[in-house]
C-alpha cells in the first residue's frame, strides 16, 4: 500500500502537458491536505483534489478551471490504479463573482451504501445527488441561516495564500456532508462566520429540508448508533478538553 500511494505523486513534473490534458490526467491532481475528505465504496476510495499546477489553478486559469477541474479522484485498490475523475466543473453560482469564491472552491461529499454520491460545494447552496455511475439524479438544498458571505476578492495565488486562513476562519461556507444509511438522513454542516457564536446544521430526508438548527461551533455529524447521532470529536486546545456531542431526532 505504501508503494501504491507513492504513485499518486508521480506527475509529469515539468507541466509539459497542455492544460487540456492536465485537467484530464489523474496523476496531475493533488490532495487538499488542510481539509481532506476520504470516502470509500466497495473496493474504491475517493479523495477531494485540485489541479496541482499553478498555471491551471483557480485564480490563474479561472474560466477553464471552472469548466474542467475535477474535484473528486477515484482510486481502485484492487487494481492499484487511478479510476475516474468526478465532480468535474463547478455549479452556476461560481460563474458570477468567481474570484470572490477562490478560497471556497472545494467540495464535501459522502457515498451511500447503494453507491449514490451526495456532493456540496463550499460556496454553493445546493446539494447534488448522483448514482454510482455519477449520473445526476437530483439537486436540492437551501441556504444556511445568517452566513457571512462577504468573501474577499482574490486576484493572485499569492493573495490566496495570504488570506486563506483568515477567510476560512471568519467567513461562512458549507463544510461537511454526512449521509446516515440507517435513517436515510443527510446532514450538511456549515460555518456561519463572523462573530457568530454558533454554526449551523441542516438535515434532509429524500431531498426535503426538515431542519436547520444552531449547533456548537465546529460540530460535524460522524455517524449513528441507535438511538443517537454522534459528532466528530472537537478539541479545545486552550482548555485541554475534547468534546463529543450526541443527539436524538
Label each PLM-derived region with a short phrase.
Residues 1-249:
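Eukaryotic scaffold repeat domains enriched in small/polar residues
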